[in-house]
């Protein structure tokens, strides 16, 4: 072999190795070893803070304080696990435990969730005496600062180059004729995550009753309580565990813990299978713990179920559904409540053909979330109360989180219709400094005020928030009287709006096909 051929072979091998390394680590701005070392340091601090907090776990006589401490311990545990995922992904980018296969997107999501968890921990002490909060505030502040320093070590999301082609504007929550939607039969070459079985792909669209266990109030199922069925599910399952919940009103608070992966819940329909609770802030619960249904395990799927909180408007924060589940889907479900109905706390989530009702901040949290073809209905609340549909909680400019509401119907629920002239309803308000929400091609009724958006407190966040509107229609979609804030944007073309599509915002093309749910991956279909 000539020296030249030998040199070329070595060069090609070097390029292959170099390309592989770049593929694995080009999402980081620092060497993987340095990134992992920083994570390990933070995990040690988390353990120290947890040790301090655990001393107050049995604090008696103050329900709200007990719940706040319990929340913090859970949230710190969440953060520790999310950091562990991030470290593992950097050491083994092709590992089976990774989320979507896009390691950069996965890592940004998990680090963002860890950051939000600490803020939620502190918020839980609102309304308490402050003694415990003051004892742990310093440690929590240190932890929060360390997590904020970790996020910029991950490269920001690359801007999409492709622009979707224009098409007809959707006229409501149903797809118009000719609208092209993604289906799992479209492209058999789609790469599914390792944990997806072939028969899982159409699970949510199937009309059959294929399930592992069933729940029925009349005793005809395996269990009469939903929580008993959840306990039956294996921990960290790599395959779906399907629970069929028969029709009925289930009066229980349900919590799916972080270790319960890939649980699927199938009901008999909206307002047919109903999970109901009435916890509220006024009755001593933290907002986080007030949820009727809470899910943290990765890969959760729900179909044909209503989640409701019946506490009423006078009880203030009262969550119907809280999700911290990464890569979760809610299909043909309803979330019914008043203030803080749907808590999209953290992680990547997708809602399709759902009904969401409420009054104040009734879609809130710091998840990275897309809503498509949903009915979003404002209700009548307390006298002189203003309705706000969204209150997105992005706290740091490096977080990937935000809300993208698409192809949906924004209107008034039946109880509000007679009071449209006395109850003002807004698209949202900035709960946190970098609040981010966009509305894309929705039908907005006259329930939406001409100015569109509401301040949180004077000029707080008006120049740092990111609110956008693109090609909405209907009586409430007029732009001439919209707010003039520095952070408010009207998208005149698809360049900015493309950043908030399913394919870009939540990397849905990488994981939604595995669920079988229909979705629109662009702006024009």
UniProtKB/Swiss-Prot annotation:
Annotated positions for site Transition state stabilizer: 339
Tissue-specific expression: Expressed in siliques.
Functional pathway: Glycan metabolism; pectin degradation; 2-dehydro-3-deoxy-D-gluconate from pectin: step 1/5
Region (Disordered): 157-192
UniProt record, GO biological process: cell wall modification; defense response to Gram-negative bacterium; pectin catabolic process
Disulfide linkage: 354-374
Top enzyme category: hydrolase
Region (Pectinesterase inhibitor 44): 30-153
Binding annotation for substrate: 287, 317, 429, 431
Family annotation (Gene3D superfamilies): Invertase/pectin methylesterase inhibitor family protein (1.20.140.40), Single-stranded right-handed beta-helix, Pectin lyase-like (2.160.20.10)
Main subcellular location of this protein, as a coarse class: secreted
SMART domains in UniProt: PMEI
Record's keyword annotation contains Glycoprotein: yes
Cell compartments where the protein resides: Secreted, Cell wall
Record region (Pectinesterase 44): 212-509
Signal peptide: 1-19
Catalytic activity: [(1->4)-alpha-D-galacturonosyl methyl ester](n) + n H2O = [(1->4)-alpha-D-galacturonosyl](n) + n methanol + n H(+)
Positions of the catalytic residues: 340 (proton donor), 361 (nucleophile)
A GO CC term attached to the entry: extracellular region
Cell membrane as UniProt keyword: no
UniProtKB keywords: Aspartyl esterase, Cell wall, Cell wall biogenesis/degradation, Disulfide bond, Glycoprotein, Hydrolase, Secreted, Signal
Note: The PMEI region may act as an autoinhibitory domain and prevent untimely PME activity during transport.
PANTHER family named in the record: PECTINESTERASE
Protein name: Probable pectinesterase/pectinesterase inhibitor 44
Species whose genome carries this gene: Arabidopsis thaliana
């Amino acid at each position: 072999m000539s020296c030249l051929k030998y040199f070329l072979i070595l060069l090609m091998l070097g390029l292959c190795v170099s390309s592989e390394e770049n593929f694995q680590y080009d999402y980081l701005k620092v060497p993987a070893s340095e990134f992992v070392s920083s994570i390990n340091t933070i995990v040690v601090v988390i353990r120290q803070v947890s040790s301090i907090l655990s001393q107050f776990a049995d604090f008696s006589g103050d329900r709200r304080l007990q719940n706040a401490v319990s929340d913090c311990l859970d949230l710190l545990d969440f953060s520790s696990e999310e950091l562990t995922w991030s470290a593992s992904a950097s050491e083994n980018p092709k590992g089976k435990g990774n989320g979507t296969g896009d390691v950069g997107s996965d890592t940004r999501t998990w680090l963002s969730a860890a950051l939000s968890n600490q803020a939620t921990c502190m918020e839980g002490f609102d309304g308490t005496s402050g003694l415990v909060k003051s004892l742990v505030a310093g440690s929590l502040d240190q932890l929060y600062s360390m997590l904020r320093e970790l996020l910029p070590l991950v490269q920001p999301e690359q801007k999409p180059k492709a622009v979707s082609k224009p098409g007809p504007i959707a006229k409501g929550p149903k797809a118009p004729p000719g609208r092209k939607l993604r289906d799992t039969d479209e492209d058999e070459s789609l790469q599914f995550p390792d944990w997806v079985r072939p028969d899982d792909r159409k699970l949510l669209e199937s009309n059959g009753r294929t399930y592992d266990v069933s729940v029925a109030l009349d005793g005809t199922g395996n269990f009469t309580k939903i929580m008993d069925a959840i306990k039956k599910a294996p921990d960290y399952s790599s395959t779906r565990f399907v629970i069929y919940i028969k029709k009925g009103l289930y009066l229980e608070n349900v919590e799916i813990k972080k270790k319960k992966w890939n649980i699927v819940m199938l009901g008999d329909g909206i307002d047919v299978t109903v999970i109901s609770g009435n916890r509220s802030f006024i009755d001593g619960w933290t907002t986080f713990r007030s949820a009727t249904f809470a899910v943290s395990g990765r890969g959760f799927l729900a179909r044909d179920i209503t989640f409701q909180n019946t506490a009423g408007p006078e009880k203030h924060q009262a969550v119907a559904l809280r999700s911290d589940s990464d890569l979760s889907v809610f299909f043909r479900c309803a979330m019914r409540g008043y203030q803080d109905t749907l808590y999209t706390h953290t992680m990547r989530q997708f809602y399709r053909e759902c009904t969401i009702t409420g009054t104040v901040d009734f879609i809130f949290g710091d998840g990275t979330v897309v809503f498509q073809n949903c009915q979003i209905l404002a209700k009548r609340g307390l006298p002189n109360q203003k309705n706000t549909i969204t209150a997105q909680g992005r706290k740091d400019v490096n977080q990937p989180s935000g809300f993208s509401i698409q192809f949906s119907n924004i209107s008034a629920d039946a109880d509000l219709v007679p009071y449209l002239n006395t109850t003002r309803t807004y698209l949202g308000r900035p709960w946190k400094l970098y609040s981010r929400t966009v509305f894309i091609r929705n039908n907005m009724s006259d329930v939406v005020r001409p100015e569109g958006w509401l301040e949180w407190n004077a000029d707080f966040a008006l120049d740092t928030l990111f609110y956008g509107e693109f090609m909405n229609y209907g009586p409430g979609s007029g732009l001439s009287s919209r707010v003039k804030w520095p952070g408010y944007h009207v998208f005149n073309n698809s360049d900015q709006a493309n950043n908030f599509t399913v394919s870009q915002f939540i990397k849905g093309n990488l994981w939604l096909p595995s669920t079988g749910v229909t979705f629109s991956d662009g702006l024009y279909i």
